[in-house]
């Protein structure tokens, strides 16, 4: 049985952070990124359509789920322009909202670069693997993937389910608690 795999877009499929930093410089707080996205980038179609692809899936994702605030049509156009698999896009407009209610039952596993999304999804019953990125390396190696190769995802998913996932809540509360 093939896994139903869901994907985040920014910093999982495409590079968001480097084009952002090139344009705005290093933020002093994460809230600066949110403010610049909500006030400036929300209107900049070319920025979103021209983000470079950093990880290309070798499978058809079940869905994409993103916290992008612009028109969903721009995300679809980005996928088409970059010859990426087109799948349903679930968009969460609030950065602090959980992706879990939108995707639970629709995927077997979700791939995200955000530690907060990774923790939230796993705590809410959606197995999530962490796409390796410079900004998330404080999380350990278990549950981390380095490509969007289906075989790597399946291997990591099976290991994750057999080891960390059953005790995820206890481990997270011990670490961040």
Region annotations inferred by a language model:
Residues 1-45:
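Active-site neighborhood of HAD-like aspartate-dependent phosphohydrolases
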């Amino acid at each position: 049985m093939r896994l139903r795999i869901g994907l985040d877009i920014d910093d999982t499929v495409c590079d968001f952070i480097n084009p952002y930093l090139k344009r705005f410089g290093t933020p002093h707080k994460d809230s600066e990124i949110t403010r610049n996205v909500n006030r400036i980038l929300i209107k900049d179609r070319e920025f979103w359509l021209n983000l470079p692809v950093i990880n290309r899936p070798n499978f058809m994702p079940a869905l994409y789920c993103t916290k992008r605030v612009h028109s969903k049509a721009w995300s679809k156009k980005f996928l088409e322009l970059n010859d990426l698999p087109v799948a349903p896009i679930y968009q969460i407009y609030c950065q602090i909202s959980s992706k879990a209610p939108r995707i639970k039952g629709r995927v077997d596993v979700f791939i995200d670069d955000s530690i907060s999304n990774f923790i939230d999804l796993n705590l809410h019953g959606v197995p999530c693997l962490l796409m390796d990125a410079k900004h998330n390396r404080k999380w350990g190696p278990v549950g981390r993937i380095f490509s969007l190769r289906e075989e790597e995802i399946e291997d990591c998913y099976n290991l994750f389910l057999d080891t960390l996932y059953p005790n995820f809540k206890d481990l997270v509360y011990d670490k961040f608690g």
